[in-house]
Design a protein with these regions (language model features):
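Positively charged n-region of N-terminal signal peptides that target proteins for export
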Residues: 1-4
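Bacterial N-terminal signal peptides
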Residues: 6-21
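A conserved glycine-rich beta-strand in the N-terminal activation segment of trypsin-fold
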Residues: 176-255, 495-588, 595-598
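Extended terminal
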Residues: 25, 494, 517-518, 545-663
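Hydrophobic, ordered structural segments
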Residues: 53-54, 180, 185-190, 194-214, ...
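Structural boundary/hinge residues at secondary-structure and domain interfaces
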Residues: 25-178, 222-280, 300-416, 433-446, ...
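Intrinsic, low-complexity N-terminal interaction/targeting segments
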Residues: 93-97, 101-108, 164, 251-254, ...
């Protein structure tokens, strides 16, 4: 249910090949490091320090071998043709692939998403072509030819280090109605490509000495790279990246407005109003084929406390951002009831009690009406027809600070195969159980059942996901107060939306935890696990990943996770292959439908990627390994590191229990 490193690297490389960048090795290249060239208005930046070395390292990994597997060739060619025929916006219309750009890279290859004076994002690709001059000239010719095929009009050609600019008509498949511009130049041994000719002129002018007001001069950039960059050797051809989250999101919105105006809140604006602009920057480094790791990454989210605030105080930020409290703990390994053969496991330390209080302003802002959150909490307590529960005292105060997420799937793969279980630590499990029973027993849509000797409550009707206990935290395209004067109708819509998330949910209290499962079968498996050899903690592949994480991130941690990439990616792979991804009932499928759909309720989007040429999953399973991630909370943010281990380093495949969906 999550996107693993395999998906990010393998599939993402295919779909975004024309913008995947690389960066500079050392100062001997055709220009200074790109972070000294791109301006301080850069909102997103990626660099690979040495293109040829990066290419060799990537090709040696399981991801590189996967892309070179003959069985994948039809799918890869299909994706490339789809990209070429899509006439995609921005630089996509140049028809460049990742191989095209890496072929001309003799040093750094970098990409910048830069906010222009208009508030929109402009894209710049910068490649050091030292030693690859002939290939670079050939690529320039290819781009000129592509522009002619796209019916582009050359509007400016300068002498010397010429900057070539083409005006392009709206693409047939882009959904855009305005013309676009694409510009490129070969200045010495620097290839510069972008969609803003004025910005490219500035970049070309700074290739010699760089600029003072560069992205590298930003304090947040310095803090992020200072934490992460020294974690890898300079010879590793590392991928370095940086993003200024909210400004990037705001500029992206301005650059890519929806085709149709949709009702609902502006989440980017809301996050800014609610104090989440306290996150000043995020970034890090990624290396491939690194001493036994297929992939290793180090990330820093830089969020220093506001001036005059204490780093360990819940008041370090303003308003809803105060919920960003993830206390470190000594041991957050998998509990004895986590089954040995699950696809993925994550444990997170989270100050739930603080979040319950601080989320108030965020909920009200999303709904567009002050007091909605308090009204919901009060109605649960005071409504004579309700459960009459004090959520804060009877539930939240009885829960601890640890949350666990388990993901898995049933076979054969179908639109309802994915499984999810959330476990919240209970410091007073008896009181939590009493609260759950009081709430569920009066709800006609919940059936009292027995699961491994424990009282549980199963949803038998799709009227709501987790009745009464589910505090209404609306998400997605939520009706807003400005667009719906009928409060009851609006809140009914919110409940109907929540219903879709866990339509078969089961709730119980056992093993000192409140369990919320997407389906009864995953809860049965968890409660039947007796520890020792049945538990995830005893699996050798988990132990190997945990050992590496402990070495890279020793001490207390706020998060730990483990993923078996093959099992994690398999449901999405099979659904993509069947052409059924838009029908998926999983959370992942619903999120994709929300992002890629037309925003109209009840409609099923068309799958945009043709997966019919994908090989049988068993033919490519061997390329997927295991992955782990850990996070530590710091006084000025959060530090995250993770690894992916190739299958060759693992024990024989963990035998999965034969799990089939209930009839």
């Amino acid at each position: 249910m999550r996107i693993t490193a395999a998906v990010t690297v393998a599939v993402g490389t295919l779909l975004s090949s024309f913008v995947v960048p690389t960066g500079v090795a050392e100062a001997a290249g055709a220009f200074p490091p790109s972070e000294k060239i791109f301006p301080a208005s850069t909102r997103g930046w990626v660099s690979i320090s040495h293109g040829p070395e990066f290419r060799q390292r990537f090709n040696r990994t399981q991801y590189g071998l996967l892309l070179k597997d003959p069985s994948m060739k039809p799918f890869i060619e299909s994706v490339r043709k789809q990209i070429e025929n899509s006439n995609g916006g921005r630089l996509g219309r140049l028809g460049l692939t990742l191989d095209d750009l890496l072929e001309v890279a003799g040093g750094e290859y970098a990409l910048g998403a830069i906010e222009s004076p208009t508030g929109k994002l402009a894209t710049v690709v910068l490649v050091d072509t030292t030693g690859r001059e002939a290939e670079a000239r050939s690529l320039i010719e290819k781009m000129n030819q592509r522009m002619v095929e796209q019916k582009g009009t050359k509007v400016a050609v300068n002498g010397g280090d010429s900057l070539t600019v083409y005006q392009l008509p709206p693409g047939e498949n882009t959904g855009r109605t305005t013309e676009q511009r694409v510009a490129f130049a070969l200045s010495g041994n620097a290839l510069v490509v972008g969609d803003d000719s004025a910005l490219l002129t500035q970049v070309i002018g700074t290739l010699g000495q760089g600029r003072g007001d560069c992205v590298g001069s930003l304090p947040a950039f310095g803090e992020v790279m200072g934490r992460c960059q020294n974690q890898v050797p300079t010879s590793a051809a590392a991928v370095r990246w940086y993003v200024d989250p909210l400004p990037f999101a705001k500029a992206y919105q301005a650059t890519n407005p929806p085709r149709e105006k949709r009702k609902g809140p502006d989440y980017v604006a809301i996050l800014g109003r609610q104090g989440f602009d306290a996150v000043k920057g995020a970034g890090g480094v990624v290396v491939f084929d690194d001493g036994g790791h297929a992939l290793r990454h180090h990330t820093m989210v830089y969020a220093p406390p506001l001036e005059g605030r204490q780093p360990d105080s819940v008041e370090r930020f303003n308003l809803a951002a105060r919920m960003l409290q993830f206390p470190n703990a000594e041991d957050i390994g998998p509990q004895q009831w986590v089954p040995r053969d699950v696809s993925g496991w994550t444990s997170l330390q989270f100050d739930l009690r603080n979040a319950f209080v601080t989320v108030e302003s965020l909920v009200d802002d999303i709904v567009g009406e002050k007091g909605v959150y308090d009204d919901v909490i009060a109605s649960v307590k005071e409504d004579p027809d309700g459960p009459q529960i004090d959520l804060e005292k009877d539930l939240v105060a009885c829960l601890g600070s640890r949350a666990t997420l388990i993901t898995d799937h049933t076979t054969p793969i179908g639109d309802d195969s994915e499984r999810l279980l959330i476990a919240l630590e209970a410091v007073d499990p008896e009181r939590v159980a009493a609260t759950v029973a009081k709430s569920m027993s009066i709800d006609p849509d919940m059936a009292k059942i027995d699961v491994q000797g424990n009282v549980a409550w199963e949803l038998i009707d799709r009227s709501m996901a987790i009745p009464q206990l589910e505090v209404e935290l609306p998400g997605g395209a939520v009706p807003h107060a400005d667009h719906d004067e009928d409060t009851h109708r609006r809140r009914t819509k919110l409940r109907e939306r929540e219903e879709k998330l866990l339509p078969h949910s089961v709730v119980t209290v056992a093993q000192g935890h409140l369990f919320i499962a997407s389906h009864r079968d995953i809860l049965e498996r968890v409660l039947a696990t007796k520890g020792d050899v049945e538990a995830l903690g005893s699996a050798m592949d988990y132990t190997q990943v945990a050992t590496e994480l402990n070495r890279l991130l020793p001490g207390k941690a706020a998060t730990r996770s483990f993923t078996r990439e093959d099992e994690a990616i398999r449901p999405a792979y099979e659904m993509l292959r069947q052409g059924s991804m838009p029908k998926s009932k999983s959370l992942t499928g619903q999120v994709l439908n929300g992002i890629l759909g037309d925003g109209k309720p009840g409609t099923v989007r068309t799958q945009r990627l043709d997966g019919s040429t994908l090989p049988d999953f068993e033919m490519v399973r061997r390329y997927f390994g295991t992955a782990g991630v850990g996070m530590q909370s710091l006084p000025d943010g959060w530090y995250i590191t993770g690894v992916t281990l190739p299958r060759s380093q693992q024990e024989p495949e963990v035998a999965r229990r034969p799990v089939t969906p209930p009839q």
